[in-house]
Amino acid sequence: MTFRMTSLVLLLLLSIDCIVKSEITSAQTPRCLAANNSFPRSVMVTLSIRNWNTSSKRASDYYNRSTSPWTLHRNEDQDRYPSVIWEAKCRYLGCVNADGNVDYHMNSVPIQQEILVVRKGHQPCPNSFRLEKMLVTVGCTCVTPIVHNVD
């Protein structure tokens, strides 16, 4: 065998060995951090929110005045921070016109925002926390419908 061929065979064998070892490791149960008396029982986290008291106060009734109004629903999960997240649900399939009637020639669609939440761990490590992405509906908007012409 040439040096190049020998190197490729060794690389292949090394790769297979790594894959097998990683599958054996991943099949085992994850280990939790051991309890330690010097580890604090609670941790204080300071959240610094910029522009908290800005003068750009928004009207709180956008959900009623919109041409695509929505209702807010409480999403509560005690194992998550924040534990309460308010989510929007579009009231109509169509949009509200200037007369206050629903116009089904337009579509009311949700506006979604991805946020980060902290989730409390469960078995086998109940005292752990993990950061998760969550898709939240924050409002609704009015759009023109997608029309497919059949020829």
UniProtKB/Swiss-Prot annotation:
Cellular compartments annotated: Secreted
Family membership noted in the UniProt record: Belongs to the IL-17 family.
Protein origin, superkingdom: Viruses
Sorted UniProt keywords: Cytokine, Disulfide bond, Early protein, Glycoprotein, Secreted, Signal
Organism: Saimiriine herpesvirus 2 (strain 11)
GO cellular component: extracellular space
Signal peptide: 1-22
InterPro entries registered for this protein in UniProt: Cystine-knot_cytokine, IL-17_chr, IL-17_fam
Cysteine disulfide partners in this protein: C90-C140, C95-C142
Disulfide bond in keyword set: yes
SUPFAM superfamilies: Cystine-knot cytokines
Residues with glycosylation annotation: N36, N53, N64
Single GO MF descriptor: cytokine activity
Record protein name field: Viral interleukin-17
